Amino acid sequence: MYKRQADNLATYIRVGSIPLTLEEVSSNIVGAQLGHAAIKSSLVAAAIGLALLCLFMIVMFRIPGLVATLSLIIYTSLVLFLVSVYDLTLTLPGIAGIILGIGMAVDGNVIIYTRIREEIGAGKSVESAILSGYNKATSSIVDGNVTTLIAALVLYIFGTGPVKGFATTLAVGNIVSIFTSLVITKVIMKLLYNFGIRDAKWYGKNVYRKTLDVLSIKKWAAIGSAVVIAAGIITMAVQAGLGNRALNFSLEFVGGSTTTFTFDKEYTAEEIEDNIIPVIRDAAGITEVQQQKVADSTQVSFKTSDLSLEQREAIENAVTAKYPIKDGTIVETDTISSSVSATVKRDAILSVILATICMLIYIFVRFRDIRFALAAVLALLHDVLVVIAFYAFARIPVGTTFIACMLTIVGYSINGTIIIFDRIREQLKTANSKTNITELVNSSITSTMSRTVYTSITTLIMLIVLFIMGVTSVKEFTLPLIVGIVVGAYSSVCLTSAMWYVMGGKKRGVVEENNKKAASKKEVFEDGSQV
């Protein structure tokens, strides 16, 4: 479609129908060899990650883990089928979206299987535990995926081409994961049960665990988070004071040009500064040039102010004349005007604000308690600030994938929060005036702890493999995601419930309030139980 539009525009211009002069505001030239290597390494990472994920699920969950393995294979096949049928452009971030989606697809399975274990541990038969586990896990799975879909939708609306690709594959993956988690796995589980696999030992059961007093560390958790965020702010202030940018903004945010050479040998940072950068300055007639070496490779990127086509050609000719590039590679250039970078900044801010507001509204509607919504949003703000602090510490480039990274973390983090809040809400429905709210919250956190740990591990497996095997741009995207997943798990366990508790959840009135809501609407499951 875009090619046809471009051809039509070119035709109009040639015949003089449109009296205008074209001005380059953004351009990108990428070597085919780099693209091929990046896609190949990402696909291999996906295959290895999927194999490790399946092994982990089988070891931890036995028969349900085997079911999860089959559902993951079906999930991956369906996602790739939909990408092919609808001719979706598969960018590097798009592939990352598929890989991340595989990790997140396991989330639903873990929620269901930990529920089944709880039901078996409570004395129910395997058949009854399967039915009850699926029914009780449905709302959590739907809520978690809807919040991620909100983030994907916002990314698609405000993102550029590569980010749109990531948002598309992430959204497709979320929709497919709901289907595979709630339909496919249930069918396979029932078939295995009907074929005679009925012994509880094949499904596992939760052993009694002492309730952890998580609320007792809420003050220290808050202090620790505040220290990390403050350190990030101080780091940004110091960088600004030294004349650098507070964060390592890439071209998308500040505008300018990046020229990347893959030399035939590796040069040290000092050699580049003393020998190559002066050649670039003289060729283009500029003063400010920044270098960025790619670890364990001969690739070097040079950031400058906006360059004209003539300046870019002059740099390429001057540098390659003295410092030959590797055979089979080309000089890659990327230019973004200040007008485009201003738009990117605006869209980045709007996307985070809009996604946060949408999630707040959704959580409020689902839980009918503004305290749950406020606690969740404050936790999301915490996660975003901690990851931004990490960007400041590590000086990772902040570009368009930064938006995708932040909204993915927001969408993922809210999943863990919803699971705990859902358990608190469930226990509040059966609570009375004598119920100790502190114990209720601690019990809810403890009972969902295994789910938080397992889902974090499954997602981290995919991300770590992708980080190890991916190209530089993929590493810069996955590393903050890894940090975000860990931070999200921490905030879900240590902060969100504590904030709800402090904001009034600890009061006796919250029990009476929720009992009234429960009386007006009871959830009845297929096995006849009520919650």
Residue ranges and their predicted role:
Residues 1-531:
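A structural signal for conserved, well-ordered secondary-structure elements
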